[in-house]
Curated annotation (Swiss-Prot):
3'-5'-exoribonuclease that specifically recognizes RNAs polyuridylated at their 3' end and mediates their degradation. Component of an exosome-independent RNA degradation pathway that mediates degradation of cytoplasmic mRNAs that have been deadenylated and subsequently uridylated at their 3'. It comes from the Eukaryota. It comes from Arabidopsis thaliana. One of its GO terms (molecular function) is RNA binding. The gene is SOV. Residues 1-109, 229-249 are annotated as: Disordered. This is DIS3-like exonuclease 2.
Length: 1055
């Protein structure tokens, strides 16, 4: 197992590292600070009655021509340059096993009344008279109460897609402003803006939708597009409450106070104003004539090509459109985590005695609102009659702790007449301010299976103690006399890779990478294989691991533990001093590791520290001595440095920032964090793992060009990359974006001039990461006519896959099987051709691939027989496996990011305040975005409409002057208290705090950050782009709202 730091250097580029920053919402519990970056697509758990919501949207209504909002309204729309576009669509294979339902969650009435099609069963409305019936009348589609237009029928969708009048896309919501959503169309470089609830037409984050584009004349200007005229600075947009109001008016929705904040279904609560009867008609109108004219100029081309041509001709325009159908519902609909608005319901009940004789009584025709923790989701309506009995009883008893409990819900219906989806509660986790409930909610939300392994999957495991069978000794290459060692984190137990090096005559080296042969134990189509495929990846939390494979395999018989005979897949390269591969050998082996080194141990050896065999160092096994180990580590370090330099000369790109490492007490509770960076020993291991992955990709793609699992990383988003280039040019930095290698070279030159400003280097890397797209697994058969798209942009190589971590990644097991099949095909071919074994064994896995042998009748037969024996999947099956593994890998990363945010929040909650320095990244009249280097996060600070604070924005010089008002503001308007933007202390308090810190500071934790390191600023404060300012971080939410990390200016004043 590799540590998060060692393994993620490539992953940081592969996964794009998209940052998402939340915009404040005017809703209950919605934080006004941005969130820690998380990313996206999930496979959800199986709960009672949830399968129906997983299926594609088959229900549709009759179509009629759809009317659009007027031109003035649409031209008023403004786009947002959010950083989470270019995310690949994902789907789960329905055949994979699901976890069993929680006994808490069953609600028999739901299946009868709520799990409906596009319109609910009228009988459900008859059983719920009064206010609840009025709501369901709206959902049923009363012509005077419709908000959303009917979705197109399946036939209309199919016809529009075939004619190029509509596009299939992935629906993503702006976390800063839920009224803004973006749709990613495959092959189109710019995302489509879907502005407003009506245009979004009940689509939810992660849905696969069909969209209809607006005419070109209605597309707004691209935000951030720089022209010769003075561009409007970022952050100068109107206040969010005004934006929200405009968005509702533009899209024909007026959500009155009774429904927005109340708890009854009022007949007049929602009034559509955009079209007749509040509904825009719904049949597919023709595409803008500009598409047709472009096609006439360019000849016969696809609709995507036409759209790309228009976007290229009008780069300053942001395309807009509307959702006309939801063709595949996102699985995240089934696991939305949030808090019940119990106080709001109680206030509603007590505010009018006519509604209820007693505030304690519950009526089935009422509902309670659920406020999602993720701001991308709308409020949910949970009818009382579908509440689990335990929650309903607590509501009746006015349990004050209920509102602090994290719950999960699934959307069961969203009718055309309801502004919010109807949901049911599926799980109760515990208090939102506690660590364990939050972790459980994170795992549940991302469908991470934390249950025990099934009995069937355990039956195929070998019994312990286990020894290598004699038949394997006979058929494998015996490397037990070779000095093989592992380098891993000190706490690692699943050791899936080992290294060796030998000096050869003539100054050559033979380097070996030995990977645990997991495919020997996990056979295709077994219960264990099904379980591993379902879990897909191990998930690493700070204090525990959720394994993909049972511990008996991942930590015992499959792990390359020191002193034990283990089965391995080995790749041996003969390298010269320039790092060129002269020859190679690939095969199944038996190895015996002589020691388990930690990264710190290996680094001490590289640094030449003496007395390496002192206390605390690992035991040696076999006949080897410490001089053998130290010589191997130093040689490997020198060779890896040569390989690394060569790789970057060939165009590789590396972008990474330092990240905090958490310190835990004996109870596993985080209490502080320190910053750490990767060591040379991390790069040592990384370099050889990259070489092994590239070698495996080359072999399997040549042997099985239609059914190999590779990993591709597309080129960055062109528009965003050009924006980054313009940003650097504006600030006097030359950036070459013509290739990954040129980008790396120019970044190194820029950062070389900034050696004394590591924070700005981090900011520059953050900007460089944002244009990067996600890396993903794919089946070569799906791109057989587009071999150029197989490449990996960040690594600058044409072929790449994952081979080196089969104990924790299912794709690696798939690759092992293909490699085993190629090896066996070589043996079969040599027997059929009656050639020498050395000549035959080199034809498919050697450094020179024998294409003639592979295309011969004997070669084809050998490859086919071997593929069948080792379970090499077909193109169709492998495509589904790739898509599912992409989804699970993304979910695992979300869990990791969410846990990082949770641990940070928990530390800040205990500290109460955390003063630190921040660097201003964006600046405007309403808010600034700051980068906190100690935590590697970005945060927004809003300072508009703050009582007692004056924020003067000087647009000509892009300067902000923040001062304190010493008289109350005149005029009307809502102003937030100063404490929301400024943490204000007096100079006397600062002196007292410093003295207290000196007396009570924990001397046992010298790495901990204390309050006396950062001094507050004074009024007036002048701020420009890249200014360093003091801020105070604090924990937001917990028991009373979603978790977040808030930032405020840290100021000092006597008044």
């Amino acid at each position: 197992m590799k540590s998060a730091s060692s393994e993620q250097s490539v992953e940081r580029i592969e996964n794009g590292h998209k940052k998402k920053r939340n915009r404040p919402q005017k809703q209950n519990r919605r934080s006004k600070q941005s969130s820690v970056p998380i990313e996206d697509a999930h496979v959800e758990e199986s709960l009672d009655g949830r399968d129906s919501s997983r299926s594609k949207a088959k229900d549709s209504t009759s179509s009629s021509k759809q009317q659009r909002p007027n031109t003035d309204e649409l031209e008023a729309m403004r786009a947002s340059n959010v950083a989470f576009n270019s995310m690949p669509p994902m789907r789960a294979e329905s055949g994979y096993p699901r976890r069993s339902a929680s006994p808490l969650l069953s609600s028999p009435e739901v299946s009868k009344q709520l799990l409906s099609k596009s319109c609910p069963d009228p009988r459900a409305c008859e059983q719920s008279p009064g206010m609840n019936g009025e709501l369901f009348q709206q959902i049923e589609g009363s012509s005077q109460r419709k908000i959303f237009s009917s979705h197109w029928s399946l036939d209309a969708v199919t016809e529009a897609l075939e004619k190029g009048e509509a596009f299939k896309a992935l629906f993503r919501v702006n976390a800063h402003n839920r009224n803004e959503a973006y749709c990613k169309i495959d092959g189109v470089p710019t995302d489509i803006l879907i502005n407003g609830n009506v245009c979004q037409s009940r689509a939810v984050e992660g849905d696969t939708v069909v969209i209809k584009l607006d005419p070109l004349s209605l597309w707004p200007k691209m935000k951030g597009f720089v022209t010769e005229s003075a561009a409007k600075p970022e952050g100068t947009n109107s206040p969010p409450e005004k934006d929200d109001k405009k968005a509702r008016q533009k899209n024909g929705i007026d959500v009155v106070e009774g429904f927005e904040d109340g708890f009854s279904k009022n007949k007049s609560s929602v009034i559509g104003k955009g079209a007749k009867n509040g509904v825009t008609p719904s049949s597919p109108p023709s595409l803008d004539s500009c598409l047709g004219s472009f096609c006439e100029q360019k000849g016969n081309c696809s609709a995507v090509d036409k759209l790309c041509g228009i976007l290229s001709s009008f780069p300053h325009k942001r395309p807009t459109g509307q959702v006309v159908a939801v063709v595949e519902k996102s699985l995240v609909r089934d696991s939305i985590v949030g808090l019940l608005d119990v106080k709001g319901w109680i206030h509603y009940k007590e505010s009018d005695p006519k509604r209820c004789k007693s505030p304690l009584s519950l009526s089935d025709d009422e509902y309670v609102q659920l406020m999602p923790a993720d701001p991308r989701f709308p409020k949910l309506i949970v009818p009382f009659h579908v509440l689990p009995g335990s929650i309903r009883a607590r509501l009746e008893n006015l349990d004050p702790n209920l509102e602090a409990e994290l719950v999960a819900a699934q959307i069961v219906d969203w009718g055309e007449g309801s502004p919010f989806p109807v949901a049911q509660i599926t799980h109760l986790f515990g208090r939102g301010s506690e660590l364990e409930p939050q972790i459980n909610a994170i795992l549940y939300q991302n469908s991470v299976c934390d249950s025990d392994f099934s009995p069937g999957s355990l039956t195929s495991l070998p019994r312990v103690p286990w020894e290598v069978p004699e038949e394997e000794v006979q058929r494998r290459k015996d490397l037990r006399d070779l000095c093989v060692l592992t380098i891993d984190p000190s706490t690692a137990t699943d050791l899936d890779d080992a290294l060796s090096v030998q000096s050869l005559p003539g100054g050559f080296f033979r380097v070996g990478v030995h990977i645990a042969d997991v495919s020997y134990f996990v056979l295709p189509e077994t219960a264990l294989d099904t379980e591993a495929r379902f879990r897909s990846t191990s998930v690493y939390l700070m204090q525990r691991k959720i394994s993909m494979l049972p511990p008996l395999l991942s930590e015992n018989v499959g792990s390359l533990s020191p002193g034990a005979d283990r089965l391995a897949f080995s790749i041996l390269w003969d390298l010269n001093r320039e790092g060129d591969v002269i020859d190679r050998w690939i095969g199944r082996t038996i190895i015996r590791s002589c020691c388990k080194l930690s990264y710190d141990h290996a680094q001490d050896i590289i640094d030449g520290k003496s007395d390496v065999a002192e206390n605390g160092w690992p035991a040696l096994h076999g006949s080897f001595k410490w001089c053998d180990v130290t010589r191997s580590v130093k040689q490997l370090s020198e060779i890896s440095t040569t390989l690394r330099q060569k790789r970057f000369r060939n165009g590789a790109l590396q972008l990474e920032n330092s990240k905090p490492v958490f310190l835990f007490d004996e109870h596993g509770v985080p209490y502080d964090f320190v910053t750490c960076s990767r060591k040379g020993s991390n790069f040592l291991v990384e370099e050889f793992m990259l070489l092994a992955n590239m070698t495996a990709a080359e072999v399997i793609s040549q042997a099985y060009p239609a059914s190999s699992l590779l990993r591709r990383h597309p080129e960055p988003n062109t528009r965003k990359l050009k924006e980054f280039e313009g940003f650097c040019s504006k600030h006097g930095m030359d950036l070459d974006i013509s290739s990954s290698g040129q980008l790396q070279d120019s970044l190194e030159k820029i950062t070389g001039n900034l050696k004394d400003d590591s924070v700005f280097v981090d900011i520059l890397n953050n900007y460089a990461i944002k244009p990067m797209q996600l890396a993903s697994y794919f089946c070569t058969g799906n791109l057989k006519d587009s071999v150029a798209e197989w490449g990996h942009y960040a690594l600058a190589v044409p072929l790449y896959t994952h081979f080196t971590s089969p104990l924790r990644r299912y794709p690696d097991i798939v690759v092992h099987r293909a490699l085993a099949a190629a090896l066996e095909a070589e043996e079969l071919y040599s027997k059929q051709k009656q050639t020498a074994i050395d000549e035959g064994r080199s034809c498919f896995t050697g450094i020179h691939f024998n294409k003639d042998a592979a295309e011969s009748i004997e070669g084809k037969e050998a490859l086919s027989v071997a593929a069948l024996k080792h379970g090499v999947p077909s193109t169709e099956i492998l495509s589904d496996v790739a898509a599912y593994c992409n989804e699970r890998k993304l979910a695992a990363r979300k869990v990791r990011d969410a846990c990082d945010k949770l641990y940070t929040w928990f530390v800040l909650k205990q500290k109460e305040i955390f003063p630190c320095e921040a660097r201003v990244m964006n600046l405007g009249s309403r808010f600034m975005t700051v980068y906190i280097s100690k935590l590697g996060i970005e945060r927004r600070i809003y300072y508009d409409q703050i009582e007692g604070l004056c924020a003067d924005w000087l647009e000509a010089t892009s300067t902000l002057i923040v001062d304190k008002l010493y008289s109350k503001r005149g005029g009307r308007g809502f102003f937030k208290p100063m404490k929301e933007a400024v943490y204000l202390v007096s100079p006397c308090e600062v002196c007292v705090a410093k003295c207290s810190a000196l007396s009570v500071h924990d001397t046992e934790s010298p790495e901990a950050v204390s309050i006396d390191e950062v001094a507050p600023a004074v009024f007036p404060l002048t701020i420009q782009l890249f200014s360093t300012i003091p801020v105070v971080l604090h924990a937001v939410g917990g028991d009373d709202g979603p978790l977040d990390i808030g930032a405020r200016l840290y100021m000092s004043s006597y008044y």
